């Protein structure tokens, strides 16, 4: 790995491979044998399940995983990780609601981003907005089905 930025309190398990210019935000967890493609971003408080390939940006507060080395998909909200980091039930519900609204919306990606700009300001919303509103050339990792 070269020119990577790894945030505070981030856990990289054994055999994690980061290509160049990867950005991992604070409090993220990457399990064993995760491979991250160059120029990808991993959001705060997210968890990547073992033995998968991250080829798109992974949103904050999410769990992403694949099967036997396959592409990572969002599987849900990292509720246990948020509880362990001291988030209140209201904050966890807020993250869950905002991520469901974003990923389950049938509007275009640009319209979803416009809606995201309108949500109120608080710690959780700001982390989500700051990540998702930042330009990406890689796309955002998404669920295989609705959250």
Walk through the language-model features, giving the residues of each:
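Right-handed parallel beta-helix/beta-solenoid
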Residues: 1-4, 17-19
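A positional/architectural concept
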Residues: 4-11, 28
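Glycine-rich hexapeptide-repeat left-handed beta-helix
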Residues: 14-123
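Short, amphipathic C-terminal "tail helix"
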Residues: 117-147
